[in-house]
Amino acid sequence: MLRGGICAVSGVRAYGIRENNRGLALIEGKGKAVGMFTMNKMKAAPLIFTQRLLLENGRISAIIANSGCANSFTGEEGMRNANRMAELASAVLGVDKSEVAVASTGPIGKQLDIAMIARQVQEVAKRLTSDPEGSAAAAKAIMTTDTFPKELAIKVGEVTIGGIAKGSGMIYPHLATATMLAFIYTDAELDRETMRTCLKDACDNSFNMIVVDGDMSTNDMVLLVSRGGKEISAENFKTGLNYLCKELAKMIARDGEGATKFIEVNVSLKGAPVSQGDAKLIAREILRSPLVKSAIFGERIDLACGRIIAAIGSCTSTSTSTVPEVEVISMKFRGKEQEVEVVRNGRIVGRWNHEVMKGKEITIDIVLGGGEGESEGEKETTATATAWGCDLSCDYVMLNASML
């Protein structure tokens, strides 16, 4: 790992400021670009603007992102304001407006304070830097209910990949061709099709596998910008990008609104046929259940076990693919120093040991299928998936009852 987040990539400058709950970040760095965006049909104005930019141009010279207002469900005025943000960044940085991506995060239904953004842009532009402090300031500027900035940079051979992200609530991304935002830069020499393939794979295994509250934002966005110059194989780049995105995604899950515990769910499906899509569905739906999350907050392993079983049965009942018999299930809970098996081949085993639930990190391992009754000679296949999330606390309710 490297210091510097996005600024670890040569030629990238960034900075950001916050005024109370309103922030603004600028990132400057030209390159080929691809993105992944929310599948929510109520797409925010900046997301529509940036999607069009990538379709028409395919290059980004700068990103301007504000926090404190989502500019979502804001009609024609919202689109004009998104366009105005791009104009402001274009003017102060001396880049073409058609290469300025726009992102916003915050409450839905409010118009942007363009006068404030115009003033903030001038201040931020004066302080743009390629030093690590620039990335850190930009990561802080896009925070809303986040409690800490999220940034990471790694080396894959000679190639650098750096990113910043934000997210704490309204986290149940469905990113496709994520409120969480992530901006990733690299100096890898890649064509856009390779970038698009690698980013989709990375998002499918990271941001699309985190759940805080089960609500999909109108503003979720992940951008990948390649400045080029360093050679790397597509496979090696994909491995590095997957790692970086998973680590950023786990930071978001750890920082879930009001969270007291970080939860990892590992699902293995055994039998024929099985699919990774089903394994992912089950892992996500377990973490989406408010009953499961509240039982973990209450440190009740018995309640958590029963509610997980119900969640599995519920999501597999509507699955379009074939899954193993849900009755053939095994389940373990793991803490930092303890491991408790609660279900083996569809039967409750042992006593309820609530001590394993008292740590800050809980891992739940679930195996479906492959138990007693499997046909002799039948070839067993396995599909696995991992999802990350957090518990549901009283603080989450209080925070969202009086949001910002």
Show which residues each predicted segment covers:
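Generic structural marker for isolated residues within well-ordered, non-membrane alpha-helices
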Residues: 86
